[in-house]
């Protein structure tokens, strides 16, 4: 398990999305301060060198995979509260989805920003997940064995707990 700076600040032993009876509920954020929030998440699509070359040159039958995945990730971040039952609707002020192309993989990184009462980690994770799923959809005809892997939050800042970074 990866360690993170400030990890002890997060280990209160209580799950915020359960009430005293253990039932799921949406956290009431009415009294929380509105602050600038940022989260960065990443994930990896593992495939073959041939598929990475097709993606890099735009040679896939379905078209420009990276451009399509970027737009899909941005759209997904904006729809997170529709997909994750207990997430709040947030007014996102920025979403960036970027790709680092390796020899056998593509790393997907999403950065999400907002000025709101709750964090944007779920929006960043959703952006990465849907961008990765979109890439898979676009390459599955040439590599059905491609693997989506290692989706995680890398960094968050803002709110009562301040900054957290995965080490």
Curated annotation (Swiss-Prot):
Basic and acidic residues compositional bias: what residue ranges? Answer: 11-23
* Reactions the enzyme catalyzes: (8S)-3',8-cyclo-7,8-dihydroguanosine 5'-triphosphate = cyclic pyranopterin phosphate + diphosphate
CDD domains on file: MoaC_PE
Report the SUPFAM superfamilies cross-referenced here: Molybdenum cofactor biosynthesis protein C, MoaC
- Annotated catalytic residues: 137
- Key words of the record: Lyase, Molybdenum cofactor biosynthesis
Annotated region (Disordered) at 1-23
This protein's record includes keyword Glycosyltransferase? no
**Pathway in which the depicted protein is active:** Cofactor biosynthesis; molybdopterin biosynthesis
- What is one GO biological process annotated to this record? Mo-molybdopterin cofactor biosynthetic process
Q: What is its EC number?
A: 4.6.1.17
Self-association or partners: how does it assemble?
Answer: Homohexamer; trimer of dimers.
**HAMAP family annotated for this entry?**
MoaC_B
The entry's protein name is Cyclic pyranopterin monophosphate synthase 2
């Amino acid at each position: 398990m990866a360690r993170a700076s400030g990890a002890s600040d997060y280990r209160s032993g209580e799950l915020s999305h359960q009430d005293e009876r253990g039932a799921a509920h949406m956290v009431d954020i009415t009294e929380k301060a509105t602050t600038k929030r940022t989260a960065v998440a990443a994930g990896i699509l593992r495939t073959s060198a041939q598929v990475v070359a097709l993606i890099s040159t735009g040679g896939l039958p379905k078209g420009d995979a990276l451009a399509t995945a970027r737009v899909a990730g941005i759209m997904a971040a904006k729809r997170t509260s529709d997909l994750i039952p207990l997430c709040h609707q947030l007014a996102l002020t920025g979403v960036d989805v970027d790709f680092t192309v390796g020899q056998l993989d593509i790393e997907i990184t999403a950065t999400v920003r907002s000025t709101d009462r709750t964090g944007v980690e779920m929006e960043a994770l959703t952006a990465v997940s849907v961008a990765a799923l979109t890439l898979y959809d676009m390459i599955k005809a040439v590599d059905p064995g491609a693997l989506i892997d290692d989706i995680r939050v890398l960094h968050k800042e803002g709110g009562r707990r301040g900054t957290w970074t995965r080490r």
